[in-house]
């Protein structure tokens, strides 16, 4: 099953893509809330990764929509953001994110995170 990612930053997208290739994970990118939810419905990924600093994804609203939809609520949602955005991290947790971490921790554990999304 693919992993769905909502990440605006092209450098970070390429890092995710390269790491996914290394661990044999299929990654699909989506940007807007409608795209993310539509891809989640059609692909049924085991994991959705959301950059909480995304300007296109409405990250907190999209996480809430995922978790409020009975067909999508079981999909694990991981958010990441700059550690200085404590309010954004708290909002993502409040919206139902399964895990929220600083961007540096996400980058450092990316291979493990992607591998965990394979099952």
Regions found by a protein language model. Give the residues of each.
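Conserved acidic segment of CheY-like receiver
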Residues: 1-10
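Output/docking surface of receiver
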Residues: 96-108
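Conserved phosphotransfer cores of two-component systems
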Residues: 67-73, 95
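Acidic, metal-coordinating helix/loop segments flanking the phosphotransfer/catalytic sites
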Residues: 32-47
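A short, hydrophobic beta-strand element within the central beta-sheet of small alpha/beta folds
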Residues: 74-83
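Short hydrophobic/Thr-rich beta-strand motif most characteristic of the beta2 strand and flanking loop
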Residues: 25-31
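Alpha4 helix (beta4-alpha4-beta5 surface) of REC/receiver domains from two-component response regulators
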Residues: 84-99
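Conserved phosphotransfer microenvironments
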Residues: 50-66
């Amino acid at each position: 099953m693919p992993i769905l990612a909502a990440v605006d930053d092209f450098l970070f997208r390429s890092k995710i893509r390269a790491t996914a290739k290394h661990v044999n994970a299929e990654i699909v990118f989506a940007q807007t809330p409608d795209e993310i939810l539509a891809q989640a419905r059609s692909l049924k990924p085991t994991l959705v990764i959301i950059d909480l600093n995304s300007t296109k994804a409405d990250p907190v609203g999209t996480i809430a929509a995922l978790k409020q939809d009975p067909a999508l609520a079981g999909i694990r949602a991981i958010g990441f953001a700059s550690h200085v955005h404590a309010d954004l991290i708290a909002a993502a947790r409040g919206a139902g994110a399964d895990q929220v971490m600083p961007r540096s921790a996400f980058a450092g554990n990316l291979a493990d995170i992607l591998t965990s999304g394979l099952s």
